[in-house]
Amino acid sequence: MENLKALTEQALAEVAKTEDLAGLDAIRVNYLGKKGEITAQLKNLGGLSPEERPAAGAKINEAKQLVQNHISERKAALEAQAISAKLAAESIDVTLAGRQPEVGGLHPVTRTLRRISEIFTAVGYDVAEGPEIEDDFHNFEALNIPGHHPARAMHDTFYISPSHVLRTHTSPVQVRTMKSQEPPIKVICPGRVYRCDSDLTHTPMFHQVEGLVVDKNVSFADLKGTVDQFLKSFFEADVPVRFRPSYFPFTEPSAEVDIQCTNCGGEGCRICKQTGWLEIMGCGMVHPKVFESCGVDAEEYTGLAFGIGVERLAMLRYGVNDLRLFFENDLDFLNQF
């Protein structure tokens, strides 16, 4: 019992001098643990008389409590210092220049769609839209596509039900426009379309812009002039254009439109398959059967129509060789535009 006071003072001195929590815990174990020096004083109580034990035990417990209180206070002080040091190290310098947020850009297909629309609306075309799920009449019958036509086959068309499909073109919007408006009509119909196809140059979903002009005395010369002027405006160059006879059930006569290869200048390369030309769009004069289905007098009015594959134009404009890249959401690819 003689050294209890000395042990207590020694413990308090060590507590006051320690600078870290690990050292503080070591002091606690050394003095107050099961084998600690102050705790060991309790073993000496057996050598005292019964009258002396209560007073001696009380002194030992008081010493333990005193040391424990100092340890708790020192621990709180060290933890506060640690928090203050951490806050100081992590403080924000408000005078530093801020980081600019990353700003997104328009998708190349969206850019191309907007460019096409701007070219046509600048010369008086309206923009019309329609549903992407179409009935048989608007997607096929009204466009002179009979029941035996191969375009109706399951391997070409996504059927929602026996009488409804995901539209295979935006031509149904033209049908709805002719049924709801009186000529003259001058409209483009942009939108998503769907076909059962997927490879380097085809995807199950893609975008089209179809155009329609219905008025008196509209001729194939008007169609050629419209297409030629559009392509020159889109590519911002005097690109050579050629028309080839073709077949579409909803136009007569019909034509495929080619432009001189933008990669080789007509010399022949891998992109144009050594022909020097690239197929770019289809067009023709509206078939009288289509006018009949839409309630337009084919004796009084004629019409021109054309269809543009938006991704096809985007590939040529931006030099993209795989159509599927447009739909993979690859930021490294999209950030180039």
Curated annotation (Swiss-Prot):
Listed under GO cellular component are:
cytoplasm
Q: What are the UniProt keywords, alphabetically?
A: Aminoacyl-tRNA synthetase, ATP-binding, Cytoplasm, Ligase, Magnesium, Metal-binding, Nucleotide-binding, Protein biosynthesis
A Pfam family hit = tRNA-synt_2d
Q: Report the principal subcellular site.
A: cytoplasm
Compartments, as annotated in UniProt: Cytoplasm
Cofactor(s) for this UniProt protein: Mg(2+)
Q: Name one GO biological process term.
A: phenylalanyl-tRNA aminoacylation
**Family (UniProt):** Belongs to the class-II aminoacyl-tRNA synthetase family. Phe-tRNA synthetase alpha subunit type 1 subfamily.
Specify which residues bind Mg(2+) according to the UniProt entry for this protein: E252
| Stated name of the protein | Phenylalanine--tRNA ligase alpha subunit
Q: What is its EC number?
A: 6.1.1.20
* SUPFAM superfamilies reported in the protein's UniProt record: Class II aaRS and biotin synthetases, tRNA-binding arm
PANTHER family cross-referenced by the UniProt entry:
PHENYLALANINE--TRNA LIGASE, MITOCHONDRIAL, PHENYLALANYL-TRNA SYNTHETASE
- Give the species this sequence originates from: Saccharophagus degradans (strain 2-40 / ATCC 43961 / DSM 17024)
Q: What quaternary structure, including any partners, is listed in this protein's UniProt entry?
A: Tetramer of two alpha and two beta subunits.
Query: Which reactions does this protein catalyse?
Result: tRNA(Phe) + L-phenylalanine + ATP = L-phenylalanyl-tRNA(Phe) + AMP + diphosphate + H(+)
